[in-house]
Regions:
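Active-site-proximal alpha-helical scaffold in enzymes
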Residues: 136-149, 202, 206, 221-255, ...
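Acyl-CoA/ACP chain-elongation machinery
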Residues: 245-305, 338-352, 386-393, 410-463
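Beta-strand segments within the central parallel beta-sheet cores of soluble alpha/beta enzyme folds
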Residues: 153-164, 219-225, 249-254, 330-339, ...
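A glycine- and small/hydrophobic-rich beta-loop-beta segment
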Residues: 357-381, 386-389, 396-402, 406-409
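Conserved catalytic cysteine-centered active-site region
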Residues: 1, 47, 92-134, 172-236, ...
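A glycine- and small-residue-enriched flexible loop/hinge segment at structural boundaries
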Residues: 1-151, 167-182, 201-219
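Condensing-enzyme catalytic core mediating Claisen C-C bond formation in acyl metabolism
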Residues: 5-13, 17, 29, 277-373, ...
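Flexible, low-complexity linker/loop segments at domain and module junctions
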Residues: 1-9, 154-160, 372-377, 407-409, ...
Length: 528
């Protein structure tokens, strides 16, 4: 029986509230306090450039046209300011809410907006492009930069119909350059542009990649499923590599949901972390802040009140392992299992159901078969969906705890990135995947920074809900699980294997000479 190709991750990139994804910059921002000093300086430098705080001037650096004598000193002295312009924070009124609908009427002032001063559309001719599409261009370019191999080399090795692209949004592109502009124009006394409708479509991210970056004529598409969208696209990519239909697949999502209309929608269903309830919770928890502390607006698995929206665009390049060997691509991990299931009959479309129990259990069973029970129990972790709502903290923790108990996992490390990034809707699973690749490299799982302890109604007998970074050596963790509980019953989970496990699997299939001849993975430096 012929073995299926192994879908391996050969590049990644994108951007979200924590920074750009390549070189693990955004991930490192979420584990900043656990980094070595040199890595902290590297992150600060990258963020300062993104924000336009510093610029290269020949062989030196400048701020506001004045030369910086010692860049490291400058970065260290301004560390708090630089990082305060990233991750979940107070919304920028001028950019997101000039009419005061969010800040003055709804009064929900927190958002996981892109780093202050960063404009993804400034790097190319982006006139009238919806924000998520600008983020797509930046994010996919970032991915190709991380890849380190010219795309023309892929085109020489692979026929055009063996390349595929799956990317898009869940909500649609609803800012004023997309569907938002089309819906608002007559009300505001103007008319829709010829681009509003097209640029608002949910699959337009893939179209932009095909038309403006890769020139792709192969398969294209997008599997939208609320918060599980990225994992749905990942499942598509994995399956067509395994069945031989495609050899290279771009998997991604892009979403820019920080608009007054979307905030209003989540506010209406009581899912949003608004200022009034934020202050009330801070008082209940005896925290010192009297005004809304936007930094802690999203509190997954703790005492919480609701979610925060965030912007993100994330992409990976999947390919079969033989092609990766042939071109000498770096391998960051592999995707053996992605499961998606609906909830079946239920009384409320927004309520939880059985689907997520099935998806996660399937992925954990797969890991148990591949890694064995001991490694599963001691060297894996999970990125929970962790929206920050009271309903999620009980329903998802029950799922995680039940599955952990069933497989003999005593204290399963649980992270929830939305405390840092907000909820990027379609891209939530992509944020998790990018962070996972960072954990392979640095050995650190991000904590849930906004909580002091799990809420009393959280099911955590078999869970280790991380209130501190979990620090191990690089590649200590052999596998990670990504989880998404999407609105309406769109549930998906994924098993991601680390690079050393992936390489071990590849080595069993291929000759030692083929393995030696290819630069597959550069091991990260061990921690002290």
């Amino acid at each position: 029986m012929t073995k299926k190709p192994i879908p391996v991750i050969t590049s990644f990139g994108g951007v979200n509230a924590s920074g750009r994804s390549s070189d693990h910059i955004g991930y490192q921002n979420t584990v900043f306090d656990s980094l070595f000093k040199k890595d902290q300086t590297k992150v600060l430098k990258d963020l300062a450039v993104m924000q336009g705080l510093i610029k290269a001037s020949g062989n030196s650096w400048s701020k506001d046209s004045e030369k910086i004598e010692n860049l490291n000193d400058f970065l260290n002295q301004n560390s708090d300011q630089i990082r305060s312009n990233t991750m979940v924070r107070k919304l920028d009124r001028e950019l997101y809410d000039p009419d005061g609908i969010i800040l003055d009427q709804i009064k929900a002032s927190a958002g996981g907006q892109l780093p202050t001063g960063f404009n993804p559309g400034s790097f190319y001719s982006s006139r009238q492009h919806a924000r998520a599409l600008q983020m797509t261009i930046f994010g996919m370019s970032d991915t190709l930069g991380q890849f380190g191999i010219k795309w023309s080399e892929i085109e020489e090795k692979v026929s055009p119909d063996q390349i595929a692209v799956f990317s898009g949004s869940a909500m649609g592109n609803l800012d004023h350059f997309g569907l938002g502009g089309m819906m608002q124009s007559r009300i505001k006394g103007s008319r829709s542009s010829s681009k509003n409708l097209a640029f608002g479509l949910i699959g337009m991210s893939a179209d932009f990649i095909n038309a403006y970056i890769l020139g792709n004529v192969g398969r294209t598409g997008h599997a939208a499923g609320a918060c599980a969208t990225f994992l749905f696209n990942l499942q598509l990519g994995k399956e067509i590599i395994e069945n031989g239909t495609s050899r290279v697949v771009i998997v991604g999502s892009a979403e820019a949901p920080i608009t007054p209309e979307i905030y209003d929608g989540f506010f209406a269903n009581s899912g949003l972390s608004d200022d009034k309830r934020m202050v009330s919770l801070q008082s209940q928890l005896k925290e010192k802040e009297k005004e809304p502390n936007q930094r802690k607006a999203c509190r997954p698995f703790g005492d919480n009140i609701g979610m925060v929206l965030g912007e993100s665009a994330q992409f990976i390049i999947l390919m079969d392992e033989e092609l990766a060997l042939e071109i000498g691509a770096e391998i960051y991990g592999s995707v053996p299992t992605v499961a998606s299931h609906a909830d079946g009959f239920k009384s409320s479309i927004s309520g939880p159901g059985i689907g997520n129990y099935i998806t996660l259990a399937k992925c954990v069973a797969s890991a148990n078969e591949i890694l064995g029970s001991k490694t599963l129990q001691e060297q894996t972790f999970i990125h929970a969906h962790g929206t920050g709502t009271p309903a999620n903290r009980t329903s998802e923790s029950h799922i995680l705890n039940k599955v952990a108990k069933a497989f003999g996992i005593k204290k399963w490390p649980v992270s929830a990135l939305k405390s840092f990034l907000g909820h990027s809707m379609a891209v939530a699973g992509g944020d998790q995947l990018i962070s996972t690749l960072g954990t392979w490299d640095k050995g650190v799982i991000p904590r849930i920074h906004s909580i002091q302890k799990p809420a009393e109604d959280v099911y955590d007998d078999n869970l280790d809900i991380l209130i501190n970074d979990k620090v191990e050596k690089p590649n200590f963790f052999k596998a990670a699980f990504l989880n998404a509980k999407g609105f309406g019953g769109n549930n998906a989970s994924a098993l991601i294997l680390g690079p050393d496990v992936t390489l071990s699997q590849i080595k069993k299939r291929h000759t030692n000479k083929a393995f030696r001849d290819c630069l597959l993975y550069t091991s990260p430096s061990p921690r002290d």
